[in-house]
């Protein structure tokens, strides 16, 4: 995954393209620094991000605030979003969408409306309620980091009975079993 992202960064640098960078991800920040990327707009939960977000609550859906710090400080305004996504780990995806939307001239109000209206139906961060259970479905195209984030979120849920069912990570090939074991060992 890192190698492929590195190739993407190399392409962006070679073609003088803009990079939307998750400032909260040290690996991605290091890759950008190593390549001396010049055209960057950052987002994340760090104080250095151009678009900064903060989790307010996650019971069960992600509720967060965000601020566009790329505007002048006197014009910076904080907005709140109540999403239909499970897990604090989804804030990075939401902040990426916000950052790209702002770059292309979408208003904060339009962005918030879109984020609050989005209800996942693609096996990502879905809450399914049955007669006896609540199921969190987060199964589409899992990888070690996304699965670890989902498990951490699952651990934080304050419920009497819970069970996790982990699917395959077939794209990992021969190391799939090892990566599953690492998750179980945590």
Regions found by a protein language model. Give the residues of each.
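Active-site beta-alpha connecting loops in nucleotide-dependent enzymes
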Residues: 120-123, 139-186
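Acidic, Mg2+-coordinating active-site environments of NTP-dependent enzymes
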Residues: 1-134, 159-160, 185
């Amino acid at each position: 995954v890192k190698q492929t992202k590195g190739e993407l960064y190399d392409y962006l640098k070679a073609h003088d393209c803009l990079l939307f960078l998750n400032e909260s991800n040290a690996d991605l920040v290091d890759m950008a620094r190593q390549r001396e990327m010049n055209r960057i707009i950052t987002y994340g939960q760090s104080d250095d991000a151009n678009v900064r977000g903060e989790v307010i609550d996650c019971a069960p859906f992600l509720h967060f605030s965000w601020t566009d710090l790329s505007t002048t400080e006197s014009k910076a305004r904080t907005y709140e979003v109540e999403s239909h996504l499970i897990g604090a780990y989804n804030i990075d995806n939401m902040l990426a969408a916000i950052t790209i939307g702002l770059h292309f001239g979408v208003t904060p109000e339009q962005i918030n409306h879109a984020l609050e209206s989005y209800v996942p139906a693609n096996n990502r961060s879905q809450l399914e309620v049955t007669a006896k259970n609540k199921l969190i479905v987060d199964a589409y195209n899992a990888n070690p980091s996304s699965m670890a984030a989902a498990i951490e979120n699952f651990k934080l849920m304050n419920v009497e009975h819970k069970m996790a069912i982990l699917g395959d990570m077939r794209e990992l090939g021969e190391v799939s079993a090892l990566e599953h074991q690492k998750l179980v060992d945590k």
